[in-house]
């Protein structure tokens, strides 16, 4: 009875992982060997704020879930922590910022963006892109520039007329 209950729990876990992996736009797999629980919890807390899921998953269960999603080409060995979410840039920034702080114990191993395998170099390049909020700020600045220059020009014209 105990084994059957454990098996049912694993089947439910794989089904849950499959649905989450299937809906995620980005998934990164990192080696966390030697990382303390406290530091892993700090990563989870940072991720939670950004809507990113962080979970240590048994490799065999993760492999089954990945296979069902159509991403079976990943070689899952050693100790892995899985991070996934909908924002590729935020996820990449989170992983590389955390990796800078803990380079001896936290290393990006593999990544999937829109269920396509991507290299570590690609993920690093994405991590250097501006975030969605930064891009919106840049765009807003570009849109408001003509009005800002027009108002500045009118103000300069008013000052010039006052001096004369």
Curated annotation (Swiss-Prot):
Keywords: Ribonucleoprotein, Ribosomal protein, RNA-binding, rRNA-binding
Record carries keyword Amino-acid biosynthesis: no
Domain of life: Bacteria
One MF term in the entry's GO annotations: structural constituent of ribosome
PROSITE patterns membership: RIBOSOMAL_L10
GO cellular component terms listed in the entry, alphabetical order: large ribosomal subunit
InterPro entries, sorted: Ribosomal_uL10, Ribosomal_uL10-like_sf, Ribosomal_uL10_bac, Ribosomal_uL10_bac_type, Ribosomal_uL10_CS_bac
One GO-annotated biological process of the protein: translation
Pfam families according to UniProt: Ribosomal_L10
Family membership: Belongs to the universal ribosomal protein uL10 family.
HAMAP family: Ribosomal_uL10
Binding partners and assembly: Part of the ribosomal stalk of the 50S ribosomal subunit. The N-terminus interacts with L11 and the large rRNA to form the base of the stalk. The C-terminus forms an elongated spine to which L12 dimers bind in a sequential fashion forming a multimeric L10(L12)X complex.
Function as written in the Swiss-Prot or TrEMBL entry: Forms part of the ribosomal stalk, playing a central role in the interaction of the ribosome with GTP-bound translation factors.
The protein, known as: Large ribosomal subunit protein uL10
Originating species: Helicobacter pylori (strain J99 / ATCC 700824)
